[in-house]
């Protein structure tokens, strides 16, 4: 192992006493320096050690090495064509030994046809005009203390449950001042059982929470990354919501109207959005523009929008994912906004939803005395 580390530092032009962490240096490697089979094999061994990979046999390891090499070549080619320093970067993250097809099967849902869900939700949604006059230049709910730490969904396509709990956690924290981690496992067990589907939507979670008097905390109903029998009736203490709203792009919508709706909503609270995430496989940072998105109509994942910003004139959303803090920007992805595309990047404008919750009496009393619910001054 020591030899491999020294080889890596030598190829990077770094000393062995460099303060750059092994994890970060692997992600930020200039892969043009790793072109021979021997160099790639040595890098693979270092990557395996970093991520604790152990394969069943030599055949499996050889297969994973070949995939790792193909991914390395793809990363090198894509990074060489980045449009600006702020464009998204790819790297040898923890998914570097699986193919795009394996990644989709393991971490994403089966593609969803959003048209039927839009028809169903349109029957329930409240029609209203959204406007957002003079919004702050940037916004980040993480700085307001209403976002729990990044979680890891494991090898299953249940991003919908994590996006839903994240939205409820934030709504509850904004309304009560109490940030608590909620149970994705309860949603996995109970929503899937009641819906008869393993391909859920975030709004189905909100409906279930409303109908069953709340959602359990993660401590009371911990995550197991597999479905089980619903135990909701055994949990007494619940976090409740008062309703939910949907943001749906209709045939009459314009890109500007959709942007206004999202801005208006996110300044009130984080929102859950659906997206085609196949191209998130090797993302390590920067503003994702969706140029290689396979289909804006085939939704297969859900993330939580927690804010927005801009870099050198390029606007982006800040989205919390559920693949652990060691993916992307410490578990987050920046997704370009104001692209001029009505559908948004990878279809994210199609279908968004968020729970609603009234403020507690304590916070209402404080606001009456002159304290605003949320300070919307620029961050």
Curated annotation (Swiss-Prot):
The keyword Glycoprotein applies. SUPFAM superfamilies: Cysteine proteinases. It is found in: Vacuole. Disulfide bonds join 190-230, 293-346. GO terms for molecular function: cysteine-type endopeptidase activity. Glycans are attached at residues 70, 292. It holds the Pfam family Inhibitor_I29. One of its GO terms (cellular component) is extracellular space. Residues 1-23 form the signal peptide. The keyword Hydrolase applies. It comes from the Eukaryota. One of its GO terms (biological process) is proteolysis involved in protein catabolic process. Belongs to the peptidase C1 family. This is P34 probable thiol protease.
């Amino acid at each position: 192992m020591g030899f491999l580390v020294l080889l890596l530092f030598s190829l990077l032009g770094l000393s062995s006493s460099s303060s750059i962490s092994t994890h970060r240096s692997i992600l930020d490697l200039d892969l043009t320096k790793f072109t021979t089979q021997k160099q790639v094999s040595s890098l693979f061994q270092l990557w395996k050690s970093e991520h604790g990979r152990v394969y069943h046999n030599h055949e499996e390891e050889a297969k994973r090495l070949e995939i790792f090499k193909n991914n390395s070549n793809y990363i090198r080619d894509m990074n060489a064509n980045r449009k600006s320093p702020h464009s998204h970067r790819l790297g040898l993250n923890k998914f570097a030994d699986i193919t795009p097809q394996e990644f989709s099967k393991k971490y994403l849902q089966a593609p969803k046809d959003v048209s039927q869900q839009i028809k169903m939700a349109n029957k329930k949604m409240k029609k209203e005009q959204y406007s957002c006059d003079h919004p702050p230049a940037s916004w980040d709910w993480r700085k307001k203390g209403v976002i729990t730490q990044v979680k890891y969904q494991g090898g299953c396509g249940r991003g919908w449950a994590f996006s839903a709990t994240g939205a409820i956690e934030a709504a509850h924290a904004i309304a009560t001042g109490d940030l608590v981690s909620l149970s994705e496992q309860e949603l996995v067990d109970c929503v899937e059982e009641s819906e008869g589907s393993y391909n859920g939507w975030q709004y189905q979670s909100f409906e279930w929470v409303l109908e069953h008097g709340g959602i359990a905390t993660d401590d009371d109903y911990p995550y197991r990354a597999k479905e089980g029998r619903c135990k909701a009736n055994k949990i007494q203490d619940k976090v409740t919501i008062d309703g939910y709203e949907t943001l749906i792009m209709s045939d009459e919508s314009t890109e500007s109207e959709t942007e206004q709706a999202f801005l208006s909503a996110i300044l009130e609270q984080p929102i859950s959005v659906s997206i085609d995430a196949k191209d998130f496989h090797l993302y390590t940072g920067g503003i994702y523009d969706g140029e290689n998105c396979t289909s804006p109509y085939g939704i297969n994942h859900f993330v939580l929008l927690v804010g927005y910003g801009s870099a050198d004139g390029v606007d982006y959303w800040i989205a919390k994912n559920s693949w652990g803090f060691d993916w992307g920007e410490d578990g987050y992805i920046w997704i370009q906004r104001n692209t001029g595309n009505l559908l948004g990047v990878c279809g994210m404008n199609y279908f968004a939803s968020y729970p609603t919750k009234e403020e507690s009496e304590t916070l209402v009393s404080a606001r009456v005395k002159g304290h605003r619910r949320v300070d919307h001054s620029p961050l």
